[in-house]
UniProtKB/Swiss-Prot annotation:
Superkingdom of this protein's organism: Bacteria
Record protein name field: Heat-inducible transcription repressor HrcA
Physiological role: Negative regulator of class I heat shock genes (grpE-dnaK-dnaJ and groELS operons). Prevents heat-shock induction of these operons.
Keywords: Repressor, Stress response, Transcription, Transcription regulation
Family, as annotated: Belongs to the HrcA family.
GO MF terms, alphabetically ordered: DNA binding
GO BP: negative regulation of DNA-templated transcription
Species the sequence originates in: Chlamydia abortus (strain DSM 27085 / S26/3) (Chlamydophila abortus)
Xref: Pfam families: HrcA (PF01628)
InterPro entries, per the entry: GAF-like_dom_sf, HrcA, HrcA_C, WH-like_DNA-bd_sf, WH_DNA-bd_sf
Amino acid sequence: MSKSWISKRESKLLYILLTTTELYLKTGQPVGSKTLKEYECSNLSTATIRNYFAELEAEGFLKKNHVSGGRIPTDLAFRYYVDHRADFLQDDLPETTIHLLNQLPKESQNIVKDLQKASELLGEALQLPTCFSSPRFENDSVTNIQLSLVDEQRVVVILSTEFGQIFTDTLWLAETSNYASLKRIETFLQNYLRKQPPSETLSQKEEDLGMTLYNEVVVRYLTRYCNFSEEDLYQTGLSKLLKYDAFKDPDMLALGLSFFESRCHMCKLLDIGMHRDRPTAFIGSELSDIFGTPNPHCAVITTPYYMNRTPLGAFGVLGPINLPYREIYKTLTIFADKVKESLTQSFYKFKLSFRRPCPSDPKLSKEPTLLARYSSIKLLPPKETS
């Protein structure tokens, strides 16, 4: 249906479609002609409404529920609804949503952690899984290191940075170790990072092991930090899908989860969303058309976030197709404005900068000078103890 010029009948057909879709979103139940008449179409007979239903069904906008006889909007109907109604922002947001949005982080140098908190608050406000993409922020530095013994010869190393990045890796120990020894090594490395003298005396073997672990994990960290081909992706809140009836079916839940957990899929959608100046919805079969996969029977809505006028990435939410699009669009619009204000202040106050992925630069991981350029951390030379 083209909106450039429509006849009176087409206008009425459009009205029936939008009203039916809106009622379905409110109730979650198939819409019958009698229900629609009582809801908002009192000037039309049920027979006339059924005729409109039949026409919309023939055009692929509605499908019949064989149990109740009511109509259910299709992916095409939801697309039409989103295009014509979703950005009507006159409705007030719930007080709980406003309260959560007011908790968004203010200006800070801990920028990645703040974006993660913002994503958590957005998910709590909308009760949906959330994700966001992020560039790499330059001049970051490691501020803490933690060691956790998996077994006698494996250790998990956790690095945390000034900007809130967390990096973990599992390393193999050439010789067996124990908890007490590993804690002494951890304290030794933490003191090194903070430029403090050692607080405990280590054996030569422990000192050598500490330097080996540190150098190994730093090289791995720098390689991943500096040589990347796509924006960083953060996801949270998958369990929120369980509250929706559409995902009570195990097969539907598996489809939604597998789609949301696909890094390739989510990165592409967030990249599309980052380059648009407003929220963007990807609905049902549109997702299968983009990726050539089975219809995941879910919807993804993205919105870009900015530093001043520069898009840094995008936030996204995933849920069933029958989402409250108007509320989500308004929430995302206000959310993005608040994030933009905070990021802009942070960038100017702390003189932050960032880099985009460089998939076309195969030399990046082979040049130590390039690796070191973007971080203040350094390798431990032999015998360095303070």
